[in-house]
């Protein structure tokens, strides 16, 4: 029988906020255990540092500019070849539980209108999912005009009004959006707990002998920065390392304008040491809860006798800046934003490996197909990285990412950012000598040839 696939997809998980990645404080014993029995990749880029383009790229293995999805404005096409459709054709039952973010209605309901999340299930299924249970970002739950499986669950427990009141206080892009808070809900009613419970039920109620490809898509640790009471208390007195709050250098007028957008998004006027420290505490708590719930799902698989026949793949759509360079969230090409965790564990486990080759999330697309004995979807640019479980791989020469009219790329030594409107380079960092990306070399005379070479390669990528 073909192996099962558990594809765990977090939202906005920064690449180094795991014990196995060397973080000195965060508690992630289950992710660490997966890494101890598999391979952890240290240089994985998402194809866009924002939700929808990244997710479009993951399911197709194609780049955002090819799909015409370069921002969070929708545009997903059910006719796209996807890895889920390929796996269905290879005999798999496919299921997604959590956030997909495929459709344009993934926005707050307009005045007078209502949205029931379940009305979108047919659209999501058309991408190759047999079973769909979808949820929204927490901040969209603030609207009383929105109904989701989770809001109904909270209503049944008499806690929906309490929850909505707190989420409204931290509604998107206000200063409170980034203020660390403790949830008014007990841990067992948290959204991550709900999604893990739904996953447990799905696994136990399956009535087919087909192998499964199950995507468990957590909504956390995406903002708002609200952790459950248990983990919030755990990190309350932890010694938090707050990064220097120095803003990026505005090297060109176009880049200066975009940095102003990022600054406004991050509400930088609120960003002093204590404010950022409080936010990081809650972020660590959300990561630890996701890890805890992963452990519960793995325990269910073990109880059902399925763990030793299941590949586990863990990653995220993009990262989180956590105050670094005086920014929150993503939407830029700093490592904190564009690099994501990637861990792959084979059935039964394998000796732990760390893989430093350059890898993209398009490679995850090809890898999922490879696990299931299927061909990658048509147009997929990914390369399967299954071989990395056993030995070093060559990896890629270049990595690419794009959001709107800005694009980033890197090779083994340098990272470049370019404004596509006027084709001007904005950033160049030496990733080996300056891993903190503190010294922008883009306007140095000694960098001119390298900037031109990388810029030409980036333009060629975008026009191929």
Regions found by a protein language model. Give the residues of each.
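Residues forming the ATP-binding cleft of Hanks-type serine/threonine protein kinase domains
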Residues: 432
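Formylglycine-dependent sulfatase
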Residues: 1-420, 424-426, 435-456, 460-463
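Short, well-ordered alpha-helical segments
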Residues: 429
């Amino acid at each position: 029988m073909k192996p099962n696939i558990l594809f765990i997809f977090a939202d906005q998980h920064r690449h180094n906020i795991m014990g196995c990645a060397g973080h000195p404080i965060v508690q992630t014993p289950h992710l660490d255990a997966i890494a101890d029995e598999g391979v952890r990749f240290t240089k994985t880029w998402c194809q866009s540092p924002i939700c929808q383009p990244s997710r479009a790229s993951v399911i197709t293995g194609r780049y955002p500019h090819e799909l015409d999805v370069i921002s969070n404005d929708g545009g997903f096409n059910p006719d796209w070849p996807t890895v889920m459709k390929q796996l269905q054709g290879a005999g798999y039952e496919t299921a997604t539980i959590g956030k997909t973010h495929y459709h344009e209605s993934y926005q707050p309901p307009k005045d007078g209108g209502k949205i029931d999340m379940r009305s979108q299930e047919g659209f999501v299924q058309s991408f190759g999912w047999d079973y769909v249970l979808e949820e929204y970002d927490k901040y969209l739950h603030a609207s009383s005009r929105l109904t989701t499986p989770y809001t109904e669950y909270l209503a049944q427990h008499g806690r929906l009004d309490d929850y909505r009141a707190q989420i409204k206080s931290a509604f998107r892009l206000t200063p409170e959006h980034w203020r660390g808070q403790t949830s008014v809900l007990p841990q067992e009613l948290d959204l991550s707990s709900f999604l893990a419970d739904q996953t447990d039920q799905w696994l136990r109620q399956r009535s087919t002998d087909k192998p499964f490809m199950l995507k468990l898509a957590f909504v956390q640790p995406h903002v708002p920065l609200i952790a459950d009471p248990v983990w919030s208390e755990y990190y309350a007195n932890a010694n938090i390392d707050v990064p220097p709050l120095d803003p990026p250098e505005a090297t060109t007028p176009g880049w200066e304008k975009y940095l102003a957008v990022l600054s406004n998004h991050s509400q930088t006027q609120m960003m002093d040491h204590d404010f950022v420290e409080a936010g990081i505490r809650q972020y660590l708590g959300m990561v630890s809860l996701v890890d805890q719930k992963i452990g519960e799902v793995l325990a269910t698989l073990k109880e059902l006798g399925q763990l030793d026949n299941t590949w586990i793949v863990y990653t995220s759509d993009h990262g989180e800046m956590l105050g670094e360079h005086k920014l929150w969230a993503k939407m830029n090409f700093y490592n904190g934003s564009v690099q994501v965790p990637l861990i792959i564990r084979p059935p039964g486990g394998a000796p732990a490996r760390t893989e430093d080759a350059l890898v993209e999330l398009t490679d995850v697309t090809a890898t999922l197909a490879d696990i299931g004995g299927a061909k990658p979807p048509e147009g997929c640019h990914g390369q399967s990285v299954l071989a990395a479980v056993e030995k070093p791989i060559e990896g890629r020469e270049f990595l690419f990412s794009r959001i709107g009219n800005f694009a980033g790329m890197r090779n083994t030594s340098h990272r470049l950012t370019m404004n596509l409107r006027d084709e001007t380079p904005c950033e160049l960092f030496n990733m080996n000598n300056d891993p903190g990306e503190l010294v922008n070399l883009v306007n140095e005379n000694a960098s001119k040839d390298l900037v031109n070479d990388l810029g030409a390669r980036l333009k060629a990528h975008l026009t191929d």
